[in-house]
Amino acid sequence: MYNNETMMQYFEWYLPNDGFWWKRCAAKAEHLARLGISAVWLPPAYKGTSQEDVGYGVYDMYDLGEFDQKGTIRTKYGTKEEYIAAIRAFHEAGIRVFADIVLNHRMGGDELEEVKAVGDSPEDRLQQVDGKQTVRVWSKFTFPGRGGKYSRFTWDHRHFTGTDWDEDSRRTDRIYRFTGKHWAPETDPERGNFDYLMGMNVDMSNRSVKRETEKWLRWYLAQTGVDGLRLDAVKHISFPFYRELLKRLRADGYPDLPAVGEYWSGDPERLLHYLDAVDNEMSLFDVALHYNFYHASQAGADYDLSGILSHTLVSERPDKAVTFVDNHDTQYGQSLESFVADWFKPLAYALILLRQEGVPCVFYSDYYGNPAKNRPLVPNLGKMIRLRRAYAYGDQKDFFDDPHCIGWVRRGDREHPDSGLAVLLSNAGAGVKRMRMGLRFAGERFYDALGVFPEPVLIDADGWGEFRCAENSVSLWVRANAFEDLIVNE
């Protein structure tokens, strides 16, 4: 990741199925660049089980909206040509593109196969609850609409370890593990073994699968020109798989390919263990920090803000942390619903955008709002993104000395004119805190960038200033020239 990079997850779950998304992306590229976004994470671009699929019900990864399959040529987001045009528009605006890569499972098979399997418990995949039986499963993927273009590889039961659906019994209380197969030994330990997630579970130990997967990824990188990878559901895939795959890619053709993995766990020890297991070949989203935000937003004044960054990836391994407030999975109605309360979102975004540790990822619905779910945009989020790009530089000093009012200062650097700022947060009453900007700021006035407090803060001869914030809110204080610049560019 680059210094002071700001990523945006440029999609959410409830986008309309009108096929215009890639065109909308291209139209917004220049705006996002002016705002200060340096990278975007786009949704899965390949054909899913239907036109309405958000992209995680993967059917054919070679079909980027090019072939008549699953009742549609385009995906929910548009056609292959429009997708590549959107990537080109982002590149022309100076924005890097991260593609969403979903390798764990396949769905929407073309033909049924009879397969011998045993039944494992959904709650403990190491507990076998049924003996050997014959099941009929949708394990054959022949992609008739594509007709072998790009790859003649087809999938059958040999390429999967199991599924949760038998077409004959239609039971939902079993996971069918194909005989001769075993769940991958190095996955998350939740539910005994969390190799299986959904659909037809891809067998990453199969040599043919490994070869075809790497072939596809090289094809995809060459076809689209994307700059980086967002890796879905990594805790469900054998840990050595991505370690070896990323090493091979970087050794042969893609030396600077960045990757960020989604390992969904609020336990930072599991995140750290995974990073060690993959030799730090990727960054991870800081799910532990997200849950701190969520719990703080629910508890209000009962939450100790001085520990908001404790037990997180960004506090333990900041160079590998991609921080976020919410995403498409935490939205209302989704499987990992844990949406941060509206009042706390500005505080949370200040904590990821205006500090030096980690790479922040802004959620599309927080910036634009979400009419489909009647959700508002986060106030002043655009201003915080601009502040990060222009002024959030230099040494950082924390003042996390109160359970309800915390703050920090950034002391600027010579490379960024007028850089340096002060941030104060409260989860209870109005807050006041003395914070030291440093001697070089002595005599300067700092102004509230959010416009709540009209009177400036004067930095005294020893470099200290007394900063304020309103109850349950955040205040952002910048130098006089920076404040004038923000007003001009509002």
Model regions: which residues?
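Active-site-proximal helices and loops of the catalytic beta/alpha 8
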Residues: Y2-E5, R24-A33, Y46, S50-Y62, ...
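Boundary/entry segment of secreted carbohydrate-active catalytic domains
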Residues: M1-G19, Y196-N206
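Long, low-complexity, polar/charged, intrinsically disordered or flexibly structured peripheral segments
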Residues: R152-S208, A222
